[in-house]
Regions:
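Long, ordered, helix-rich scaffold segments
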Residues: 1-217
Length: 217
């Protein structure tokens, strides 16, 4: 109820004379309410999206990430997924790219997920050093987890070739360790990674990953 009160008091848009604390409270309240599909916040976010539909980068940066997430949660269409990916490719704003990566991961349609996975190996869409952010966001979502985990295993040789000299390569060992929490996923993690402990560059992270998941199961 407190978040609803904060939203009713502060609204969606920043106002003249507001304090930094007001903005922080707004962000926290909106994040919770949009995740909870609280209709007044959902409708307000949708209204902001519609007002900027022709140029979603122009959505006020302070609420843009939440507006993009809300639209994906509510619309969940292949067209919107394509729009977000196209915006990702054309923008020069790294913060906007991060917001788009997070927002598109809220999709719950297989067609959209297949489309995204089809783009990940195209360096003109996703730079190899940014791939881990897409992996982390999608792997953490229950709808996408199985498909994305299998994609990573199936494309491991390509990931290793593309990122073997980049520090973000370690993320593909560490990210699932930070997310997985079932015995089934632990067994899969061990089956895939344990044979790779002969690679000294990966051994420590793999063994730590196994311990991390096991402690959570």
């Amino acid at each position: 109820r407190q978040f609803q009160n904060d939203f009713e008091r502060l609204g969606f848009d920043a106002k003249d004379g507001e304090s930094d604390e007001d903005e922080m409270v707004r962000q926290t309240a909106l994040s919770y309410l949009i995740q909870a599909d609280y209709q007044p916040a959902v409708l307000a976010a949708a209204s902001v999206f519609q007002a900027h539909k022709e140029n979603i980068e122009s959505i006020p940066a302070s609420v843009r990430g939440l507006v993009l997430i809300n639209q994906m949660k509510q619309e969940d269409s292949l067209t919107l997924v394509e729009d977000y990916v196209n915006a990702y490719v054309t923008t020069n704003d790294s913060n906007f790219r991060r917001q788009l990566t997070q927002a598109v991961s809220y999709l719950k349609n297989q067609e959209g997920l297949d489309y995204v996975l089809g783009q990940l190996k195209d360096k003109h869409v996703v730079k190899p050093q940014d791939l881990y952010l897409w992996y982390m966001n999608f792997l953490s979502k229950s709808f996408a987890q199985e498909t994305v985990w299998n994609w990573a295993k199936d494309n491991w040789d390509w990931i290793k070739a593309a990122l073997g000299g980049d520090m973000s390569f370690d993320s593909f060992v560490n990210i699932p360790a930070g997310i997985f929490k079932t015995q089934e996923r632990l067994d899969q993690y061990i089956a895939f990674f344990e044979p790779q402990t002969s690679d000294k560059a990966l051994e420590r992270n793999i063994l730590m990953g196994i311990k991390t998941i096991a402690a959570r199961v």
